[in-house]
Amino acid sequence: MFLNTLIKTVLFKNKNLEAQSSEPLPTVHQQWNPATGGITMGMDPALKAKLQKQRYHIVGEHGGVKTCHWTKESLLRDRACYKGTFYGVKSHTCMQMSPVVDQCNLACTYCWREPHMDTLELTDQDPLELLYESVRAQRRLLSGFGGNDKVPREKFLEAQDPKHVAISLNGEPTLYTRLSEYMDLCHKHGMTTMLVTNGTLPKVLENLDTLPTQLYVSVDAPNKQVFDDVCRPKWNSGAWDQFEKTIDLLPSLDTRIVCRHTLMKGVNMSSTHIKEFAELDNRADPDFIEAKGYVYVGHSRENLSMENMPSHDDILSFSNELAPQVNREVLSESRPSRVALIGREIVPIPIPEAELYFPEDLGIAPPVKKLPLIQN
């Protein structure tokens, strides 16, 4: 009886989502979880196989960790991500993860990740388990660097206990119902949190008991028309209104705020767009603004073209035009990442004092047997 009721509840939820969408939703992937005595809504097996092929380490039912390009560069060649230049982040101590790698309420044209599941099953994985398993996964993904003569031993050992958690890998992390608890645990373990959100769930941000060390909001559209064309809400026609609520909420949040503009040539970089971006930025009053160029890679190649990829000079031109309109200046830039930092002054991100420590026997995640790719 309980199982039937739960299944009906889930299917009813998806039916409601389908009513808000112009496209039908696929079948929910259900599996019995003997540990909890209930049904778990698992990740789409085809998507999971693709993510594993791309070297994601899946954590729990919907979470995941993947080694950042700049983490590898820091270990092998002592090169730093632009976050190192802008905020003092040591790339080899940064863990890139998401509690929901497979779900998002938008389908942005510029997103280079694999398309997400077309269901929104909120995940409530235990936050301490998520943290421990993510660190174990990070150690597994970095394990091969330990035997590389090009990697300094000291840096490799430092990388085993991350100091920064970039909650930005894939999906929309504010769909994780225990996000606040997770970030609190990160801070208590002496780690910063850098949360990236699309800003369409303002109530989640408003109700967070623990805020991230640094909150990034993707401000990729200067107006509703561009938002609908570029960010492509899946179900909610009022997503732009929710996004504007987030913009107006940001000044009240007691944490570091970054508005990030992903720039696409011929899409959102005109002088008119810059003026509209400035209006949004002035309402948000962030500590920093990042102007970052779209890169023609991955799934985004199905939506955009090489011509939409701005040069670094294009990024600087945009930034130099925007900065005076928001009473800020261009503080720094990174040509390899095609990004410029706009703000009033550079202030390194503060690392919290550790109150808790990882268990000595935390260890490393075991190798994962990857799922075979499923041909559509």
Residue locations for each model-derived region?
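C-terminal accessory extensions appended to soluble enzyme cores
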Residues: I39-G42, A46, K50-R55, P310, ...
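Hydrophobic, Leu/Ile/Phe/Ala-enriched alpha-helical segments that form helix-helix packing faces
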Residues: S134, Q138, L142, I247-L250, ...
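Short Gly/Ser/Thr- and Asp/Glu-enriched loop/turn motifs at secondary-structure junctions
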Residues: H92, Q160-P162, S334-R338
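Short, solvent-exposed linear motifs at loop/edge-of-secondary-structure regions
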Residues: V89-N105, R283-G293, I315-E321
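Short Fe-S-cluster ligation motifs
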Residues: L130-A159
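Short, acidic Gly/Pro/Ser/Thr-rich loop/turn segments
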Residues: C104-A107, K224, Y296, I349
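Conserved AdoMet/S-adenosylmethionine-binding subsite of the radical SAM
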Residues: N148-D313, E321
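Flexible, acidic/Gly-rich N-terminal and inter-domain linker regions that tether
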Residues: F2-Y110, E114-T119, T123-R136, R140, ...
